[in-house]
């Protein structure tokens, strides 16, 4: 508040005039000599001047001007005399009140106190008194008590009791600039206490102590002095109530008393105001409700920061006991009569009731001397007896129902406990939708921008609007609009709290089930919002997008989230942006208690119900994978808090575990989700896999691999995962074993051993090669179980390996088992190679091994994954290097013996021949029915992969020839010869196969011709041209036997261009 002009102005002129008239009336004496008895004759002009100044007609802030005038008067009273010229000059410049005070004649405390009493300004008196320095404050109250106790009138008693009541209600006014200026003036210019005339000897209090305590002790002493002048039931009730309240609040209550609940607080306010409304003599009877509420709050909110001294407490208790004995019968008679309906009587009974309750607690918890305990006990008994005889005053009072209006007034004026009252306002169904309730909500929206309040308002609106009450639809719409505005203004964490509450209370349909009819344009907003999101997905617009979705998601969470899930999968490139929006709402991790997926989170349910198992293209599957990753490991945009909506364990449980079967269409996608989840969460500190039951998870993967061992025996509809994806399943198994082993300490030793034993027993049901893949996992606990025939060709340690009878592994199958071991991993392949028992110096043993190797290769190849086949390819090269494997080279595609150095290409030629022999074996009468068409496609693809690597090897050897063999050793002719052989072998294999599966071999043949053509053009010599012509005719003769016609013609045309 602006201090305004305190110098010459209309108000000061009126005040000055009042004092001049009083001075004239008191002439020839000076006003500084005025006594109490003179006031009635002299004081009227001053009182009338003050009333004129503080009238509403005189100024827009009448109370402020009354305060200004009283401050000026009190400052004048406190001004020391005489004033030196230097002091005058200084204060004229610095003291805000000095210049205006000089317009007033010199006055004394009698004028100040009588003026305050005439104006009934007990509240202002205490505000100004408490603004003074502590010692001066005490001195001024002492003067007031001296003033009151001399020639005490009924008005003195009334004013004294009001002042005492105001002291107890005082809470300070730290934001009042007038009081601050008055306090500053007093601290700066007033003399110390000992410079005051007649200082009270008792006042040597600690300036740091609570300033109220000494004042209350002084007032208690004052009460004892004027006791005999307290006449009439009303005054006696007030005196007893003040004394009881002082003892209760400042002595008997705990050091940190619990505030009464907001409901009790409102009830107390309603009771006080109802009594005022019925008590026509009460000064607040005619006041507006807002003023009544403000004052009633002060009456019911007494608190203390300190305790009265023990001496004061027991003096007070004895005096209260004395007064009850002396006045008790008179007051009981009045209270039981029809006269006992005033606020004073209500206060007395209420204060004594509170005293009685606290006295019992005080006696139970406080250590007192025998004498002190007796004083309190006797008083408590006296109070209880008094209350028993007057209980009807509180019990039988019929109060009007004004609680709602009071609550709204508390909110409107933002009183001390207005936020607590907001919660009652938001929850009270009886008040909802009245005109006053709607108006209060509309004008105080800012107070309701709290998640709990928004939720309570929504609960109230839903309960009331779905009950039998007839409420206009327009009013419901208006209230919902107001609530949604409050929600829109919340922070993102606040919105999440509201969303969590909505999901908890009304489930996945949110507000829509109860309020959709009143939430205008939801479907239109939904479509418009998501059209804009998909068209302008960018981090710059993320905050706006989150705000738009926030409103939609509380109206209908299910529709909103499902729409986002669908768009994130279908709309290319939007998944990351939409995931960022979704992860801004961690409340979506809500776990539904009912429904088809009662154990799953709401987010998982929406994904499963909307997009899972409904993908139409590989791109949609890829977007779904990336969406899951973004929801598990959200990218944190600047300024927007996000949290994971999916935990890795629930992703595995919901999207992987149920689908780890070869006959399930989603198995391939589930494996990709599996590996993505493992890799994305590899760095997590906590061992999250524990919640997924890792050992059953390992067994599920082993079961899947077991089905691959019987892959081509299964019907086509049960082969939903290609053999190519076997490598992914193996990789996941290896990674999972590493993670579980690394976290073995999270299991107790007993549980770990039992889990390993359980898994080992379960693996006995599966193909033995599956168990071999867990060799490292079981190491130190179980030996590797392999077919007994493996021991016939390998030097296996019985400490590490054990033989087991396996069906299908009879005599002569040792090499088959050995080759299957080599497929498992590169490490085991090296180990098997080192343990192999073949005598290189025995040609017959090498020949038999080579034949056995070919037979085993034919048996293993069709069931190999690409990585397993590549290991066999490398193994074959190692065997050729070690001369353990003999592959005789035939002359079937050689017109003449070439005079070439083919040694650098020996392995490539042998491999090419070996592959030809393998396919001759596979296509033979005894084997051709092993595989369905898809199986032939698979082996052809494996062959083409090996032949492609073989061609790469030829190019590398040829290019490095001059540096390795010497400048004169050009290997061009040798490389061309190898190309012709590979080409012929490829065409030979094509001729044995069904045309439908030959496309990869046909492409490889064309690539081989390209290699031949490119290399032959680097040597333009006559002999080279002649050789090229011969080879061209020879290759064309081979190609003539190839079908169909289109392929044959393409190959011939390619060769004609050489």
UniProtKB/Swiss-Prot annotation:
The keyword Flavoprotein does not apply. Residues 714-735 are annotated as: Leucine-zipper. GO terms for biological process: rRNA processing; spliceosomal snRNP assembly. The modification Phosphothreonine is found at residue 84. It comes from the Eukaryota. PANTHER family: GEM-ASSOCIATED PROTEIN 4 (PTHR15571:SF2). This is Gem-associated protein 4.
């Amino acid at each position: 508040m602006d201090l305004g002009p305190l110098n010459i102005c209309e108000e000061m002129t009126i005040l000055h005039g009042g004092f001049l008239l009083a001075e004239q009336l008191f002439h020839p004496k000076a006003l500084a000599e005025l006594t109490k008895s003179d006031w009635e004759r002299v004081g009227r002009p001053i009182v009338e001047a003050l009333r004129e100044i503080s009238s509403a007609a005189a100024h827009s802030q009448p109370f402020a001007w009354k305060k200004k005038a009283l401050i000026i008067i009190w400052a004048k009273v406190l001004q020391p005399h005489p004033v030196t010229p230097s002091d005058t000059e200084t204060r004229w410049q610095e003291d805000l009140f000095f210049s205006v005070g000089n317009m007033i004649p010199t006055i004394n405390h009698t004028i100040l106190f009588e003026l305050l009493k005439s104006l009934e300004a007990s509240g202002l008196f205490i505000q100004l008194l408490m603004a003074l320095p502590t010692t001066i404050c005490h001195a001024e109250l002492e003067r007031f008590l001296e003033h009151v106790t001399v020639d005490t009138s009924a008005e003195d008693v009334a004013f004294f009791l009001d002042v005492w009541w105001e002291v107890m209600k005082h809470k300070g006014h730290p934001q009042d600039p007038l009081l601050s200026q008055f306090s500053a003036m007093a601290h700066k210019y007033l003399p110390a206490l000992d410079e005051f005339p007649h200082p009270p000897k008792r006042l040597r209090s600690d300036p740091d102590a609570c300033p109220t305590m000494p004042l209350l002790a002084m007032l208690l002493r004052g009460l004892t002095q004027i006791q005999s002048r307290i006449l009439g039931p009303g005054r006696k009730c007030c005196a007893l109530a003040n004394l009881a309240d002082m003892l209760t609040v400042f002595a008997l209550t705990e050091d940190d008393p619990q505030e009464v609940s907001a409901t009790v607080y409102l009830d107390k306010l309603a009771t006080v105001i109802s009594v005022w409304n019925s008590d026509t003599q009460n000064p607040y009877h005619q006041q507006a409700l807002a003023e009544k509420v403000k004052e009633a709050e002060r009456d019911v909110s007494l608190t203390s920061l300190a305790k009265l001294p023990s001496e004061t407490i027991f003096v007070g208790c004895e005096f209260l006991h004395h007064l009850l004995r002396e006045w008790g019968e008179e007051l009981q008679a009045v209270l039981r009569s029809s006269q006992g309906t005033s606020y004073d009587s209500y206060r007395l009974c209420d204060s004594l009731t509170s005293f009685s309750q606290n006295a019992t607690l005080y006696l139970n918890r406080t250590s007192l001397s025998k004498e002190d305990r007796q004083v309190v006990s006797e008083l408590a008994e006296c109070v209880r007896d008094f209350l028993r005889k007057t209980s009807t005053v509180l019990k039988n009072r019929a109060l009007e129902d004004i609680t709602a209006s009071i609550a709204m007034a508390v909110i409107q004026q933002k009183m001390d406990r207005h936020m607590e009252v907001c919660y009652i306002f938001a929850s009270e169904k009886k008040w909802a939708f009245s005109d006053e309730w709607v108006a209060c909500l509309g004008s105080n929206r800012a107070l309701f921008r709290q998640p709990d309040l928004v939720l309570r308002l929504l609960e109230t609106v839903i309960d009331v609007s779905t009950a039998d009450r007839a409420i206009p639809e327009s009013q419901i719409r208006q209230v919902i609009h107001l609530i949604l505005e409050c929600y829109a203004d919340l922070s993102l964490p606040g919105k999440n709290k509201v969303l969590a509450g909505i999901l908890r209370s009304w489930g996945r349909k949110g507000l829509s089930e109860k309020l959709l009819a009143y939430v205008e344009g939801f479907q239109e907003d939904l479509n418009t919002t998501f059209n804009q999101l998909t068209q302008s997905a960018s981090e710059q617009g993320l905050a706006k997008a989150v705000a738009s979705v926030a409103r939609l998601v509380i109206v209908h969470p299910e529709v909103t989230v499902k729409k986002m899930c669908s768009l994130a999968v279908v709309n290319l490139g939007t998944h990351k942006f939409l995931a960022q929006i979704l992860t801004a709402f961690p409340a979506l991790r809500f776990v539904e208690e009912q429904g088809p997926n009662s154990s799953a989170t709401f987010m998982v349910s929406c994904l499963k119900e909307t997009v899972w198992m409904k993908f139409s293209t590989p791109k949609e599957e890829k977007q779904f994978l990336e969406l899951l990753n973004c929801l598990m490991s959200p990218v944190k945009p600047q300024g927007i808090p996000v949290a994971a909506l999916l935990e890795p364990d629930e992703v595995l449980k919901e999207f992987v575990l149920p689908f780890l079967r070869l006959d399930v269409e989603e198995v391939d996608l589930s494996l990709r989700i599996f590996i993505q989840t493992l890799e994305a969460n590899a760095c997590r500190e906590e061992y999250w896999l524990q919640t997924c039951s890792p050992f059953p998870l390992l067994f599920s993967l082993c079961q899947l691999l077991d089905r691959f061992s019987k892959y081509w025996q299964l019907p086509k509809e049960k082969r939903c995962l290609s053999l190519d994806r076997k490598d992914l399943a193996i990789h996941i198994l290896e990674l999972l074993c590493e993670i579980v082993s690394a976290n073995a300490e999270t299991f107790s030793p007993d549980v770990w051993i039992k889990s390993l034993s359980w898994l080992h027993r379960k693996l006995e049901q599966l193909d033995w090669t599956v168990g071999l893949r867990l060799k490292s996992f079981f190491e130190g606990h179980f030996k590797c179980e392999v077919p007994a025939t493996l021991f016939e060709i390998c030097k296996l340690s019985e400490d590490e390996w054990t033989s087991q009878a396996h069906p299908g592994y009879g005599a002569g199958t040792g090499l088959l088992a050995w080759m299957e071991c080599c497929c498992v991993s590169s490490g085991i392949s090296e180990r098997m190679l080192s343990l192999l028992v073949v005598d290189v110096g025995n040609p017959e043993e090498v020949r038999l091994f080579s034949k056995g190797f070919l037979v085993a290769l034919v048996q293993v190849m069709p069931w190999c994954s690409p990585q397993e086949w590549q290991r066999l390819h490398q193994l074959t090269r190692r065997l050729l290097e070690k001369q353990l494997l003999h592959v005789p080279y035939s002359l079937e595609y050689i017109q003449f013996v070439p005079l070439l150095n083919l040694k650098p290409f020996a392995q490539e030629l042998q491999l090419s021949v070996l592959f030809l022999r393998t396919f001759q074996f596979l296509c033979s009468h005894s084997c051709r029915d092993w595989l369905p068409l898809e199986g032939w496609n698979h082996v052809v693809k494996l062959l083409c992969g090996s032949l492609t690597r073989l061609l790469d090897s030829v190019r590398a050897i040829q290019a490095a020839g001059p540096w390795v063999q010497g400048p004169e050793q050009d290997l061009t002719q040798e490389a061309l010869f190898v190309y012709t052989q590979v080409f012929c072998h490829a065409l030979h294999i094509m001729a044995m196969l069904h045309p439908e599966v030959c496309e990869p071999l046909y492409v490889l043949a064309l690539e081989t011709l390209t290699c031949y053509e490119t290399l032959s053009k680097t040597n333009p010599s006559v002999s080279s041209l002649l050789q090229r012509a011969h080879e061209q005719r020879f290759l064309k003769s081979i190609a003539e036997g190839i079908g169909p016609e289109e392929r044959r013609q393409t190959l011939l045309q390619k060769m004609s261009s050489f």
